[in-house]
Amino acid sequence: MHLKASSILALLVIGANAYPASANSAAALVPEPQQPEAPAVAGSTVGAQVDIHHPRLEARYGRDEPQIMCGYCGKRFWNKPDLEKHIKLKPSKGGHKGQPYKEHSWNRPT
């Protein structure tokens, strides 16, 4: 499609006049900011506090040492499953297999 320069100029003038002057201003072209709406989900955590004392989150919030301690040897762990795995290992692998389970606790040091 070949248009002459006068036809292109006419289309530009018509296009510019199609909108009111206020719509051509920069302020009218910028959309207004909108606040995001909170999700209406029953299990939503919006506004809920995070339990920073959870063993997996303690390092993230400033505690750089594991807090769950083996009551038998004093070795510290980040979570209870790691402690239980440690207890079930043979002594040559760093565990306490064969020791009474009562002697092992997951008390947090004070």
UniProtKB/Swiss-Prot annotation:
Its main location: secreted. One of its GO terms (cellular component) is host cell nucleus. The keyword Heme does not apply. Residues 88-110 are annotated as: Disordered. GO terms for biological process: effector-mediated suppression of host innate immune response. InterPro entries: Znf_C2H2_type. A zinc finger (C2H2-type) spans 68-96. GO terms for molecular function: DNA-binding transcription repressor activity, RNA polymerase II-specific; RNA polymerase II core promoter sequence-specific DNA binding; zinc ion binding. Induction: Expressed during multiple stages of host plant infection, including prepenetration, early biotrophy, late biotrophy, transition and necrotrophy. PROSITE patterns: ZINC_FINGER_C2H2_2 (PS50157). Residues 1-18 form the signal peptide. It is found in: Secreted; Host nucleus. Disruption phenotype: Does not affect vegetative growth, conidiation, conidial germination, nor appressorium formation, but leads to significantly reduced virulence to rice. Keywords: Host nucleus, Metal-binding, Repressor, Secreted, Signal, Transcription, Transcription regulation, Virulence, Zinc, Zinc-finger. Residues 100-110 have a biased composition (Basic and acidic residues). Secreted effector that translocates into the nuclei of host cells to reprogram the expression of immunity-associated genes by binding to effector binding elements (EBEs) in rice. Binds the 5'-CCACCTCC-3' EBE of promoters from targeted rice genes and probably recruits a yet to be determined host repressor. Causes ambivalent immunity with increased susceptibility to the hemibiotrophic pathogens Magnaporthe oryzae and Xanthomonas oryzae pv. oryzae, but enhances resistance to Cochliobolus miyabeanus, a necrotrophic pathogen. This is Host transcription reprogramming factor 2.
